[in-house]
C-alpha cells in the first residue's frame, strides 16, 4: 500500500465525521460522547487551516486512511506557542502500516517550522498503539490524570504526552500562520509522497 498525504479541505468533513464518529461511539480513544455534525467538522477544517496544518492520508486509489491535525491547546493567548494534536485512522485502515508515522513525519517538522515550542497529545491510558506512536516520535509523559473521564460505564485515565519542538527563546518570534506557508507544506508533502 502506498500512503499519500494532502492538505484537508472542507469537502473532507463527511469522511472525518464518519471516522471520528466511529471512535466516539465504539471506543475510548476520545472522551467525546457526541460526534459534531458534518458542517461543524467542515467549519473546524476551515478555521484550523488558517493557523494550523490539517492533513489527510489516502492510499494509491484515493481511499481515505485517516487524518492528523493541530489546534489550539487552550483559548488563552499565552498558550499560543503550544499546539494540541489529533490523529485518527479510518476504522477500516490497516493497522501498523505506517499511516500514523507518515502523518506525523509531515506534521511535526512543519509545526517546528511555524515556530511552535511544544506539541501535546492527550491519550487514553489504555490506547497502547497511540502511546507507542507518540513515544517513537520523542514525546514524553508530562501528566497522568487518573480517572479523569467517564465513558462506556468506566472511569478512564488520560495521559498528556508532550514534545518540545523549538527552544524557549525569551522573546519568541510570532507563530507563522499556516495560510502564509501553505505552499511550503505542499512541497514537503510532494517529497514525502514521492518516497518509496
Descriptions of predicted regions:
Residues 174-196:
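Short, cationic low-complexity segments
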Residues 4-16:
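A short beta-loop-alpha structural element at the N-terminal edge
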Residues 96-109, 132-136:
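Conserved acetyl-CoA-binding loop-helix of GNAT-fold acetyltransferases
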Residues 111-123:
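Conserved GNAT acetyl-CoA-binding A-motif
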Residues 97-98, 169-179:
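Short, charged, solvent-exposed linker or helix-capping segments at domain edges/interfaces
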Residues 36-94, 104-105, 164-166:
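Acetyl-CoA-dependent GNAT
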Residues 69, 120-123, 135, 140-157, ...:
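Conserved catalytic-core motifs of GNAT/GCN5-like acyltransferases
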Residues 17, 21-44:
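Conserved GNAT-fold acetyl-CoA-binding loop/helix
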Amino acid at each position: 500500500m502506498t500512503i499519500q498525504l494532502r492538505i484537508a479541505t472542507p469537502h473532507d468533513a463527511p469522511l472525518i465525521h464518519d471516522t471520528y464518529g466511529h471512535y466516539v461511539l465504539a471506543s475510548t480513544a476520545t472522551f467525546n460522547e457526541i460526534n459534531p455534525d458534518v458542517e461543524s467538522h467542515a467549519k473546524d477544517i476551515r478555521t484550523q487551516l488558517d493557523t494550523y496544518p490539517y492533513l489527510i492520508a489516502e492510499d494509491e486509489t484515493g481511499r481515505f486512511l485517516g487524518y492528523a491535525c493541530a489546534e489550539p491547546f487552550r483559548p488563552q493567548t499565552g498558550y499560543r506557542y503550544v499546539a494540541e494534536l489529533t490523529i485518527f485512522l479510518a476504522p477500516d485502515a490497516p493497522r501498523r502500516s505506517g499511516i500514523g508515522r507518515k502523518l506525523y513525519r509531515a506534521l511535526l517538522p512543519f509545526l517546528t517550522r511555524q515556530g511552535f515550542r511544544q506539541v501535546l497529545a492527550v491519550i487514553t491510558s489504555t490506547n497502547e498503539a497511540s502511546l507507542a506512536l507518540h513515544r517513537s516520535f520523542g514525546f514524553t509523559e508530562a501528566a497522568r490524570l487518573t480517572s479523569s473521564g467517564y465513558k462506556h460505564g468506566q472511569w478512564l485515565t488520560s495521559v498528556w504526552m508532550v514534545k518540545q519542538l523549538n527552544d524557549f527563546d525569551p522573546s519568541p518570534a510570532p507563530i507563522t500562520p499556516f495560510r502564509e506557508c501553505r505552499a511550503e507544506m505542499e512541497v514537503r508533502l510532494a517529497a514525502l509522497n514521492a518516497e518509496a
